[in-house]
């Protein structure tokens, strides 16, 4: 291994650390506070993700949260793909996406109490195998139109996506990573699953804003 390869190897490790910190940024909490909507953790489900931000009644802030939480997973993958050279950037880009996803689930800034990871999951899928995002979106929309339950829609979609990726993605690392992330998303929805089983899961409602 020459000096250039050693340099890029250390650079790759540094990128993984940065990916985690980027993933840890709680955009939902930051945006709702900036918009003076209060602490999103005290609203609805108490989650910092898009669905709960939407419950504040501010659709623009919810959309911005969705965008930024998604891009967390995509940007780090793009950086790894185009800047990690000459070492194998395929495995590094996959790991960068996973570290960003892990950071969203367990953010250091919030004492490791983060979101459920759906938006960042989509961002990682976008960076690794973009057709998976289309499959997720179609399944989510169909499920939501029938039940109006965001959590159920997400659970159905993340269950189907790994199967699709396994069938059509040529990358072993991508297949494994998306499958692991799907399991983690399901685990993070454990409270939602319990409520779904007893018929007490909250449907998506938007808080009316005064004025």
Swiss-Prot record:
Gene Ontology MF term list: acyl-phosphate glycerol-3-phosphate acyltransferase activity
GO cellular component, one term: plasma membrane
UniProt keyword Protease present: no
GO biological process entries: phospholipid biosynthetic process
Spans traversing the lipid bilayer: 10-30, 64-84, 90-110, 126-146, 164-186
Domain of life the protein comes from: Bacteria
Chemical reaction(s) catalysed: an acyl phosphate + sn-glycerol 3-phosphate = a 1-acyl-sn-glycero-3-phosphate + phosphate
Pathway participation: Lipid metabolism; phospholipid metabolism
Subcellular location: Cell inner membrane
Family the UniProt entry places it in: Belongs to the PlsY family.
Subunit structure comment from the entry: Probably interacts with PlsX.
Protein name (Swiss-Prot/TrEMBL): Glycerol-3-phosphate acyltransferase
């Amino acid at each position: 291994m020459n000096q250039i390869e050693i340099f890029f190897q250390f650079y790759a490790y540094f990128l993984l650390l940065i990916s985690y910190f980027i993933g840890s940024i709680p955009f939902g909490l930051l945006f709702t506070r900036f918009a003076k909507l209060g602490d999103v953790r005290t609203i609805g489900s108490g989650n910092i993700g898009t669905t709960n931000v939407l419950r504040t009644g501010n659709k623009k802030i919810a959309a911005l949260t969705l965008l930024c939480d998604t891009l967390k997973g995509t940007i780090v993958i793009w950086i790894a793909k185009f800047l990690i050279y000459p070492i194998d950037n395929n495995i590094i880009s996959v790991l960068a996406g996973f570290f960003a996803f892990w950071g969203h689930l367990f953010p250091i800034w919030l004492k490791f109490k983060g979101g459920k990871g759906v938006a960042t999951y989509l961002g990682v899928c976008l960076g690794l195998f973009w057709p998976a995002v289309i499959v997720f979106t179609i399944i989510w929309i169909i499920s939501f139109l029938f039940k109006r339950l965001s959590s159920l829609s997400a659970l159905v979609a993340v269950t189907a996506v790994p199967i699709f990726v396994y069938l059509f993605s040529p990358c072993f690392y991508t297949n494994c990573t998306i499958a692991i992330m799907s399991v983690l998303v399901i685990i993070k929805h454990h409270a939602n699953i319990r409520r779904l089983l007893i018929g007490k899961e909250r449907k998506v409602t938007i808080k009316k804003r005064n004025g």
